[in-house]
Amino acid sequence: VTESYDDFINNAQTWGNGNMWQSDFKDSPSAQWEIKEVKRKLYRAVANVNILEGIRFYVSFACSFAFGELKLMEGSAKIISLIARDENQHLAITQNILNKWKAGDDPEMKQIMKEEEEWTYAMFDRAVNEEKRWADHLFRDGSMIGLNDALLKQYVEWIANRRMKAIGLKPVYDIAAKNNPLPWTQHWISSKGLQVAPQETEVESYVVGGIKQDVKKDTFSGFKL
């Protein structure tokens, strides 16, 4: 992700510091090629963020939620669930951007997405394989109740298929869309299924500074029990 961002920033700065964007040159073949390369770097940066938010960390998320399902370290699991929901918000933003480009919001970006399809699949595959290796590392000494490395690997493939389909790519992993290997993770990621007791969370509904300030000595003179 940082490499893609660096490439885009450096490329954009080179474009901005040059003169190809000026009216005298912007319609020349060289200028058109340069601006397209800037857009290509932008696409790769956004696509990498999409993969980051949509696939990476999900092995760790699932492990944290598994402890929560066992009533162990529930506080940590609930905090991690908030992080996962935040990731989902970022994911939705990048999906919206990519789908706008794919629909022709910018015709040149639509062309770039088609040209970069092979690269995009390679980035998805790289992220999936790295998450699988992390699952192997976490469960190198054995499994836990309800979770093991094999299930996690299937889960990562299932998520990757969903992420690819969401941006108009064909899913490549052999796992049915309806067969979530870890269905119990959904209520941790979705705010609809999670209940939090008041004593376990920060309550923000208290009235602050609600004391009546104009009380005088005779205010309660007519008060009787």
Predicted regions and their residues:
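Non-heme di-metal
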Residues: 1-225
